[in-house]
Amino acid sequence: MTTHNSQYSAETTHPDKQESSPAPTAAGTTASNVSTTGNATTPDASIALNADATPVADVPPRLFGSFVEHLGRCVYGGIYEPSHPTADENGFRQDVLDLVKELGVTCVRYPGGNFVSNYNWEDGIGPRENRPMRRDLAWHCTETNEMGIDDFYRWSQKAGTEIMLAVNMGTRGLKAALDELEYVNGAPGTAWADQRVANGIEEPMDIKMWCIGNEMDGPWQVGHMSPEEYAGAVDKVAHAMKLAESGLELVACGSSGAYMPTFGTWEKTVLTKAYENLDFVSCHAYYFDRGHKTRAAASMQDFLASSEDMTKFIATVSDAADQAREANNGTKDIALSFDEWGVWYSDKWNEQEDQWKAEAAQGLHHEPWPKSPHLLEDIYTAADAVVEGSLMITLLKHCDRVRSASRAQLVNVIAPIMAEEHGPAWRQTTFYPFAEAALHARGQAYAPAISSPTIHTEAYGDVPAIDAVVTWDEQARTGLLLAVNRDANTPHTLTIDLSGLPGLPGLGTLALGKAQLLHEDDPYRTNTAEAPEAVTPQPLDIAMNATGTCTATLPAISWISVEFHG
């Protein structure tokens, strides 16, 4: 996660950062020349799967991951609050756990993030009363270490999630990573494994996916490195970890964002050097409406098209990974772990940092090292939810290369779940598109043929208004259509033809299930603690025709999901 020390936040949609030519449109999408000012009830867009449609790939369960960092109130006051009325014997908030399960999260990256780069994992084990307090240099806070890997493992068992564990490559490195691996996954009989048993966890945690550092290209990162420095370091750590335990899946740090001056060359340098020992490379991208304070129309339209940037990001990193494979005469593809993505209004964080600096210059000081302060607690709009739904569509359409993803973060900190101190937990607008995909996108993903009117953006040129993805589980005969209208002004009516799905005997054999629409006439409307259901998906007006096709109208700035079965 990028801090104010970078030129921009970890997102890449600012028009000044674009190349002179428009970004390519999403794969499988063609732009029609239909006017966007026509009659919204007359179909002007179509989604179709032809009989010869081939799947992108199997939908990987890890695509629906999230992220818990020791940052703000994500851990303390989020997943862990011993004094809360719903807290269990471990101090975990049951109301938050219930929402995490409802969200459908499969895998959680922990404990950072920038935090991990000066974190000693040993500080978080053993009796809580013996754990030291430390200064967290990333977020300028005091870390109490009440939560550590043992506690988070217990939480993940209750949440039903896999753990993706990150190791410190900022102030530490090879030995600390090997010690933590032994502690976490070792069978009893060695020093660190026996310490785990003594701390109450008898069986190995069996954590398979490990991130070797976080955003090590960023000058804000404690111990940041050049591409060559990190390439050598990650190669040594990954090699040693795989000697210690076969079957691990190791993630190298990719660029912190597409705005970084070494974007692309960083990935090629790192992956070429450490190709044999790596399985994934990370991708990080955040987006926000840069004109949100004035509600500028052009900025909103650019924001709605953010998935164009994510598509280009995936293509660039995939190309670098392929070049590394060719340089090593290899056969395996390095997969992408998009382990930080979502909407983050980083301008608010930058303003907070500027205020603190100004106060310090005047001799005014806020609490220098606070414990779990309110940080990055963005409240999301209906438009934000549509954009996150659009980004999820993009991840699914590229799941042949993006085999893991973590929507950042999980609770309170730029999160779909908010938890009031000593109060209720509630769903943000962004909760709903993620949950629908996480719970119902199964089987194989398909990028349908899409014909769509175009919209003009300052950042990306002319792009299709409509984007969509289809998933289909042929064995269970269940499927899901996700679609968005990225047009800020005009509704569009879709004709949907899914007759080309494999295993169907013919047209008219599909039955519609639950169909939902997320849209608000005021795209800036939010949920709050006082009105937690102000923005929720509503039933979508859709019907199957005698020909086996469907028609549905998508208002401007909207997301839909349609469950179906054969």
Curated annotation (Swiss-Prot):
Report any one BP term from Gene Ontology.
arabinan catabolic process
Q: Which residues bind alpha-L-arabinofuranose?
A: E69, N114, N214, Y286, E340, Q409
| This enzyme's EC code(s) | 3.2.1.55
Per the record, its GO cellular-component terms are: cytoplasm
Query: Catalytic activity, per the record?
Result: Hydrolysis of terminal non-reducing alpha-L-arabinofuranoside residues in alpha-L-arabinosides
Region annotated Disordered sits at 1-39
Q: What is this protein's pH dependence?
A: Optimum pH is 6. The enzyme retains full activity at pH values from 5.5 to 7.5. After exposure to pH 4.5, the activity is reduced by 40%, and no residual activity is detected at pH values below 4.5 or above 7.5.
Where does this polypeptide localize? Cytoplasm
Ordered alphabetically, the record's keywords are:
Carbohydrate metabolism, Cytoplasm, Glycosidase, Hydrolase
Pathway the protein takes part in: Glycan metabolism; L-arabinan degradation
Give the top-level enzyme category.
hydrolase
Q: Where is the active site?
A: E215 (proton donor/acceptor), E340 (nucleophile)
Kindly list the residues the record flags as site (Important for substrate recognition). W344, Q409
**Comp. bias regions, Polar residues:** 1-12
Q: Which Pfam families does the record cross-reference, listed alphabetically?
A: Alpha-L-AF_C (PF06964)
| Bias kind Low complexity: ranges | 20-32
Give a brief account of the activity's temperature dependence: Optimum temperature is 45 degrees Celsius. The enzymatic activity decreases significantly at temperatures below 35 degrees Celsius and above 60 degrees Celsius, although considerable levels of activity are still detected at 20 and 70 degrees Celsius.
The Swiss-Prot or TrEMBL record annotates one GO molecular function as:
alpha-L-arabinofuranosidase activity
What is the regulatory mechanism acting on its activity? Completely inhibited by Hg(2+) and Cu(2+) ions, whereas 1 mM Zn(2+) inhibited activity by 51%.
Q: Which family does it belong to?
A: Belongs to the glycosyl hydrolase 51 family.
The record's subunit annotation is: Homohexamer; trimer of dimers.
Protein function: Involved in the degradation of arabinan and is a key enzyme in the complete degradation of the plant cell wall. Catalyzes the cleavage of terminal alpha-(1->5)-arabinofuranosyl bonds in different hemicellulosic homopolysaccharides (branched and debranched arabinans). It is active with sugar beet arabinan and wheat arabinoxylan. It also exhibited activity against alpha-(1->5)-linked arabinobiose, arabinotriose, arabinotetraose, and arabinopentaose.
Spell out the protein name for this chain.
Intracellular exo-alpha-(1->5)-L-arabinofuranosidase
- Protein's organism: Bifidobacterium longum
Report which gene this protein is encoded by: abfB
